[in-house]
């Protein structure tokens, strides 16, 4: 006997696959990777355990993740993919857009340097991982929200609308 386990970033279709395979399973997702995580300070990192599947498998990973000091959250397969679309797709897409339009700066400011460091780290992620995250069925709506916000911000800039800019900044700061 065995328990199947995955740590995939997108869970779409896994529940159905697990149900067909006939083996007990456990599905988790450590929400950090080697690019940005401080592996010496895992108490600042999160892990998701899917609340479906084999009970003992879930207990095993809950114990393991607790011993590592991770913050543990339990979601369904669908809740997980919605969370990942929000928490991973938005940052990756924003980073891609930044990287696509940036050019070398001889005297970059602090904000530019920080964004550049994040962009380089994000672009060093595995291509398949990035593709998997962006092909999450819930990603499109998140990217559409970015487009909507950009359109609103561009209109404020085009109009040089100080009142609109103040309202926009108030909205995003709260």
Where are these regions (language model features)?
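Rossmann-fold dinucleotide-binding core
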Residues: 5, 10-72
């Amino acid at each position: 006997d065995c328990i199947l386990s995955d740590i995939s970033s997108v869970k779409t279709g896994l529940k159905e696959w697990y149900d067909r395979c006939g083996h007990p399973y456990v599905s988790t997702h450590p929400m950090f990777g080697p690019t940005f995580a401080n592996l010496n300070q895992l108490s600042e990192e999160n892990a998701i355990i899917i609340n479906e599947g084999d009970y003992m498998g879930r207990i095993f990973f809950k114990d393991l993740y607790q011993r590592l000091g991770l913050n543990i959250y339990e979601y369904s397969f669908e809740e997980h993919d919605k969370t990942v679309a929000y928490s991973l797709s938005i940052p990756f897409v924003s980073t891609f857009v930044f990287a696509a339009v940036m050019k070398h700066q001889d005297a970059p400011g602090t904000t530019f340097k920080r964004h550049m460091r994040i962009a380089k780290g994000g672009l060093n992620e595995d291509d398949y991982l990035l593709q998997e995250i962006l092909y999450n069925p819930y990603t499109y709506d998140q990217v559409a929200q970015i487009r909507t916000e950009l359109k609103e911000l561009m209109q404020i800039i085009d109009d040089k609308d100080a009142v609109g800019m103040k309202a926009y900044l108030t909205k995003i700061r709260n």
